[in-house]
């Protein structure tokens, strides 16, 4: 038994290194070790859908890991949780987790619990919801780093900040729904996540769910494919707080707009708090149903604009302090003066400064700052000038030519590092140059999943901030795509 647990731990450790944090949480957080023999390890999945998806996505890789670790004779078997025996169902249903653990240790109770019931108790510790109190609704996408305390307030975002804090303190009261809108990288996600984290702190019994509009869409599509729409509706219509990021990603998506409309109504009628973010005012949304737009404007709409000079200086100072670097006043002011786009670009400039200091062991001067600023401005101009006339084939053509690859390489399943890296870059460029969803990008790159594509995009985005070579390569490829 213990050896089986150890082997399962080895498998989890290996897979965790290969997946993003969100992807690992989605598929492996709710799997539990049940039993083991010399030939097999039994793992419990929360439901048949989850079981089938894990088998489909990861069985091959798990077998490879077992072989690598010298356990090639062992098979991992995924099973659904055992059903409660009818004779004990009511007893378990009305018992809290604390009471169950007491019963399990009690001598008089132990004599009447058969083996099957003990197994139920073991599983119950993991996923039975107590009916007498609310259970904390675990949310893998709420990041603890986003708080009101570390949000830098200025004239451009003060109203949005105050409204967000008020919502967290008194959800469902004053500003419901609330829509925070503004350009990219101005702090909308920071505020939305801060609302979730502060509400979770102040209202521990609340069921809170933060989700991007794209993940909301993908989950809805998946629920249709697997005939799990009832589960989807139940999940989203029985919340105390729903936070949806980047609602503009649902433009031109009529089916999900219809579903969101009904979800909105269900939550609104129960005075449950909803907060959305968007890159524009509701009235400017294209191919968005009027009745859904009217729902957004029913509550508070508040904008975040670009930071002024003083706020840009404060943002740079804070980021430099977090990264442990000292930025001379003249350099700090130069960056704040030149980079006027958004918070994300300001923080990227500081990250690039740190990379020069750490990797080249040099002191920062104005020439280095000018180079960094030119890179950032060039990248922003590329994004601004990009339109849908740049098609998929032109992007692929540049990737294949410049990285010396074939169609088979870019659309296949080769694990060679240089080819894997190229696929990451291809996904990243498709995301930046087109309006394709991650599911659509996945189909182009050899049938990859949404999670795999999202991992690729996030990986390159992160590496651009920390690896000058990768950043320069991406800029070069973008320039060639624009000229192609």
Curated annotation (Swiss-Prot):
A GO molecular function annotation here is: ATP binding
Compartment list: Cytoplasm
GO biological process, any: DNA replication initiation
Stretch list, region Domain IV, binds dsDNA: 358-484
One GO cellular component term noted in the UniProt record for this chain: cytoplasm
Keyword entries, A-Z: ATP-binding, Cytoplasm, DNA replication, DNA-binding, Lipid-binding, Nucleotide-binding
Residues annotated as region Domain III, AAA+ region? 141-357
- Per UniProt, ATP binds at 185, 187-189
Which residue ranges does the record annotate as region Domain II?
73-140
Q: Where is this region: Domain I, interacts with DnaA modulators?
A: 1-73
Q: Which family does it belong to?
A: Belongs to the DnaA family.
* Its biological purpose: Plays an essential role in the initiation and regulation of chromosomal replication. ATP-DnaA binds to the origin of replication (oriC) to initiate formation of the DNA replication initiation complex once per cell cycle. Binds the DnaA box (a 9 base pair repeat at the origin) and separates the double-stranded (ds)DNA. Forms a right-handed helical filament on oriC DNA; dsDNA binds to the exterior of the filament while single-stranded (ss)DNA is stabiized in the filament's interior.
Output this protein's name: Chromosomal replication initiator protein DnaA
Q: Which organism is it from?
A: Borrelia turicatae (strain 91E135)
- What gene name does this entry carry? dnaA
């Amino acid at each position: 038994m213990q050896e089986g647990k150890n082997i399962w731990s080895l498998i989890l450790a290996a897979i965790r290194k290969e997946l993003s944090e969100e992807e690992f949480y989605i598929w492996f957080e709710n799997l539990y070790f049940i039993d083991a023999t010399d030939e097999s390890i039994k793992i419990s999945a929360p439901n048949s859908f989850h079981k089938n998806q894990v088998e489909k996505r990861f069985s091959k890789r798990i077998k490879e890991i077992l072989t690598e670790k010298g356990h090639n004779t062992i098979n991992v078997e995924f099973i659904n949780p055992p059903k409660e025996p009818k004779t004990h169902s009511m007893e378990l249903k009305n018992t809290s987790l604390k009471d169950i653990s007491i019963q399990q240790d009690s001598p008089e109770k132990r004599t009447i619990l058969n083996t099957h019931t003990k197994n139920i108790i073991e599983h119950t510790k993991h996923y039975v919801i107590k009916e007498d109190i609310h259970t904390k609704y675990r949310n893998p996408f709420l990041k603890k780093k986003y708080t009101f305390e570390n949000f830098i307030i200025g004239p451009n975002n003060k109203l949005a900040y105050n409204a967000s804090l008020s919502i967290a303190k008194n959800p469902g009261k004053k500003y419901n729904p609330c829509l925070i809108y503004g350009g990219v990288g101005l702090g909308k996600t920071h505020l939305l996540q801060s609302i979730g984290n502060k509400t979770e702190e102040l209202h521990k019994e609340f069921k809170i769910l933060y989700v991007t509009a794209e993940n909301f869409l993908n989950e809805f599509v998946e629920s249709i494919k697997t005939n799990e729409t009832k589960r989807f509706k139940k999940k989203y219509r029985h919340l105390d707080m729903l936070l949806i990021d980047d609602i503009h990603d649902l433009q031109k998506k009529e089916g999900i707009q219809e579903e969101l409309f009904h979800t909105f109504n269900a939550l609104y009628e129960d005075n449950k708090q909803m907060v959305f973010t968007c890159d524009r005012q509701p009235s400017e949304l294209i191919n968005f149903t009027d009745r859904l737009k009217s729902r957004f404007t029913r509550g508070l709409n508040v904008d975040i604009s670009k930071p002024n000079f003083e706020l840009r200086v404060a943002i740079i100072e804070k980021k430099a302090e977090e990264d442990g670097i000292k930025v001379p006043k003249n350099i700090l002011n130069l960056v704040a003066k030149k980079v006027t786009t958004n918070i994300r670009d300001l923080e990227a400039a500081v990250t690039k400064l740190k990379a020069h200091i750490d990797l080249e062991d040099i002191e920062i001067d104005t020439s280095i700052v000018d180079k960094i600023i030119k890179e950032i401005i060039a990248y922003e101009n590329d994004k601004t000038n990009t339109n849908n006339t740049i098609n998929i084939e032109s992007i692929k053509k540049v990737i294949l030519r410049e990285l010396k690859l074939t169609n088979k390489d870019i659309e296949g399943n080769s694990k060679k590092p240089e080819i894997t890296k190229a696929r990451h870059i291809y996904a990243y460029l498709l995301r930046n140059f087109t309006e394709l969803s991650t599911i659509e990008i996945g189909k182009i790159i050899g049938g990859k999943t949404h999670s795999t594509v999202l991992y690729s995009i996030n990986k390159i985005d992160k590496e651009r901030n920390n690896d000058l070579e990768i950043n320069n390569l991406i800029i070069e490829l973008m320039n060639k795509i624009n000229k192609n």
